[in-house]
């Protein structure tokens, strides 16, 4: 059940960000990290990319939730947390590559 609910929430969040992307950098809505908020171009890409990853991760987690049913609650919770961490890591890696291709790290981090 955890995987189904968590996966569903990830899918909904991803769809909402895809349909209604935050237009400008803000501290309320969107993919907010130091790197993504350092530049409008990075902000736009972070929200676009992470929304796609959230939808994909949500589908995988929801599928696992359907397969596992209410069994293995801890495993479903671990998979949900892993999906969030992987989404964060892949998005930050993409932003870092974009930043370095522009000739420097604008966030002040290496």
Swiss-Prot record:
Enumerate the UniProt keywords alphabetically: Cell membrane, Membrane, Transmembrane, Transmembrane helix
Q: State if Ligase is listed as a keyword.
A: no
**What Pfam families does this protein map onto?**
SdpI (PF13630)
Q: Transmembrane residues, as ranges?
A: 4-26, 46-68, 72-91
Coiled-coil regions, chain positions: none
> Which cellular compartments is it found in?
Cell membrane
This protein's membrane topology, according to the annotation, is: Multi-pass membrane protein
A cellular component annotation (GO) from this entry: plasma membrane
What is the protein name stated in its UniProt record? Uncharacterized protein YfhL
Keyword Flavoprotein assigned to the entry: answer is no
């Amino acid at each position: 059940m955890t995987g189904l609910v968590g996966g569903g929430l990830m899918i909904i969040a991803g769809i909402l960000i895809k349909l209604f992307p935050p237009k400008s950098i803000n501290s309320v809505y969107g993919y907010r990290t130091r790197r993504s908020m350092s530049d409008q171009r990075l902000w736009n890409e972070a929200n676009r990319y992470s929304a796609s990853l959230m939808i994909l991760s949500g589908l995988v987690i929801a599928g696992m939730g359907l397969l596992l049913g209410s069994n293995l609650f801890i495993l479903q919770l671990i998979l949900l947390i892993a999906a969030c961490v992987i989404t964060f890591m892949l998005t930050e890696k993409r932003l870092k590559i974009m930043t370095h291709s522009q000739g420097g790290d604008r966030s002040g981090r290496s």
